[in-house]
Amino acid sequence: MEPIRVIESRTVVLPRENVDTDQIIPARFLKVTDKKGLGKALFSDWRYAADGAPRPDFVMNRPEAQGCSILVAGDNFGCGSSREHAPWALVDAGVRAVISTRIADIFRNNALKNGLVPVVLDAASHAKLLAAPGASVRVDVEAQTVTLPDGSTARFPLDGFARYCLLNGVDELGFLLAQEADIAAFEGGRR
């Protein structure tokens, strides 16, 4: 995982509420264990017609969405089953942060383990983002703030360990492995 301090990007806005993990990446794409290439399956049933052609009216298929790394989603994003493929698909598609008023706990935990920043904002700040698709936004992980299109900032919660991992580019296992020598010394002293 790469360290994440600040994400600056235009936003792509997906105002649908209760987007579940099966909508993020349908079950038929879950037969792989490699994260690479899953971005093509992101929102597949909404992005592509039955013949596989891109639907030009879907927000992520529009030219202005290209290169955006911040997804502004409706309330209760990532609900449904535990599916680590969902954050894998988002990250593989270039999304670095998801902003909503509520993000499902299991999705949030999976996102953090995979370098995707889950940002929960108050309703008023979120409404400003929903009303300004394509606006430039800054997510500051270190300060735990989002700079909104009007220049104001909104704070978002992030527990200390998750913040540490994002800022240092490590996941939980990487953190534990980095402590291996200290753990061995502690265990050796107990014998």
Curated annotation (Swiss-Prot):
GO terms for MF: 3-isopropylmalate dehydratase activity
Keyword Translocase: no
Catalytic activity as recorded in UniProt: (2R,3S)-3-isopropylmalate = (2S)-2-isopropylmalate
Role according to the record: Catalyzes the isomerization between 2-isopropylmalate and 3-isopropylmalate, via the formation of 2-isopropylmaleate.
Pathway: Amino-acid biosynthesis; L-leucine biosynthesis; L-leucine from 3-methyl-2-oxobutanoate: step 2/4
Listed PANTHER family: 3-ISOPROPYLMALATE DEHYDRATASE SMALL SUBUNIT (PTHR43345:SF5), 3-ISOPROPYLMALATE DEHYDRATASE SMALL SUBUNIT 2-RELATED-RELATED (PTHR43345)
Superkingdom of origin: Bacteria
Mitochondrion recorded as keyword: no
Disulfide bonds: none
Name used for this protein in its record: 3-isopropylmalate dehydratase small subunit
Subunit structure: Heterodimer of LeuC and LeuD.
CDD domains, per database record: IPMI_Swivel
Pfam families attached to this UniProt entry: Aconitase_C
One biological process term in Gene Ontology: L-leucine biosynthetic process
Keywords: Amino-acid biosynthesis, Branched-chain amino acid biosynthesis, Leucine biosynthesis, Lyase
Record-stated family: Belongs to the LeuD family. LeuD type 1 subfamily.
EC number annotated for this UniProt entry: 4.2.1.33
A single Gene Ontology CC term: 3-isopropylmalate dehydratase complex
